[in-house]
């Protein structure tokens, strides 16, 4: 039955359409579906199309279907709202500081707000038929459990780039089935993600030795912020950050991931002294100020943003040219979310530069490594599960005696190349002119479908979709 709801959406990329069909088919078999697709490949656009199909089916059959979309940050809620508007899906928002409009069948809610003790009656009264959870790797938290208790048999979809938990306990206690998309490497080969050059400190560096000796962890199992600050927020290490930026990414647009507000401010100050156009953002930055910085960053008026976990999830700026990792982590989720911010392809970006100043790849391998998502989904009850822990850092103490001056400098670890036949840039087959792009923008603003635009330019539909993506019009 549910598989019949899925419709062909010409604005989706081929793999998104395939994923949408698979999601509806999975709902024929079970209630709770988790879907994995890498950062930067369009999960929000995908589930917005799912919602549009459900709503259309309900209208056609005279059934008022209610849908609740859940996210854990206001930036994600606003991004979801923007995508729903593109599909002309009227909706309300349930989040702190937002005026509620509960007459709409579709509601986008903050998990913190909808499960707050003052709103739990509201959550139950919504009487929803479908629940969509963004960044669903968070869904094992107690706040999400309240939704499962309220709606045990409601159809649910959880989307995430990383179905992974620090304790490796899996997700089978809340989800019935995991659907997995193509790998990062396949998306790069097909041109839907950008290739990269990966620079890192060596495995016998003094920084890794110090990181390996940290023995203070937070409740989730990651390094304690205070311990990280003690090890990483030192002038010599910040100098290494600046030097590696100047050597490999100077003048490029990028994001730096830092440990804390204090660490972020220290990095920002030293980069500014070197003449870099840079700002820092964290959770305490006023929302209007944060939006202004992000807009200026997108417009090219700011070159670098240093942030503390603000841009790990949901941030969309395709023309980011480099990512710098200045914060060690034991979380595969953080690692892939952070490097993934730089892998969106654009017409003017041949590849992304990744500056790994903390040796994260020694813990998690390269961004394009094969991941055992099904094993992580099943968790510890699966005896063949390969834990995402590395012996590299455990062996650092054995390598201390090999430390030499200069080992903290970055070297090229991996350089992904893509054959020209596989590149995402359609300019290989069609030379796009400025006036072509202006016409594309006009047709897009008029909400012409890719098939109509393809007829105008006498190009195949897939080439048009790729060009629209390159221009950030889709």
Language-model region placement:
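Conserved Walker A/P-loop ATP-binding site and its immediately adjacent core
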Residues: 46, 63-84
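A short beta-strand element within the Helicase C-terminal
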Residues: 304-307, 313-328, 334, 341, ...
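Post-DEXD/H (motif II) to motif III coupling segment of the RecA-like Helicase ATP-binding lobe
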Residues: 138-198
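Conserved segment of the helicase C-terminal RecA-like domain
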Residues: 342-371
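Conserved interdomain linker/interface between the two RecA-like ATPase lobes of SF2 helicase motors
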Residues: 178-255
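Conserved helicase ATPase core of P-loop NTP-dependent helicases/translocases
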Residues: 96-102, 265-266, 276-308
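Walker A/P-loop
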Residues: 29-50
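Conserved pre-motif I regulatory segment
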Residues: 1-36
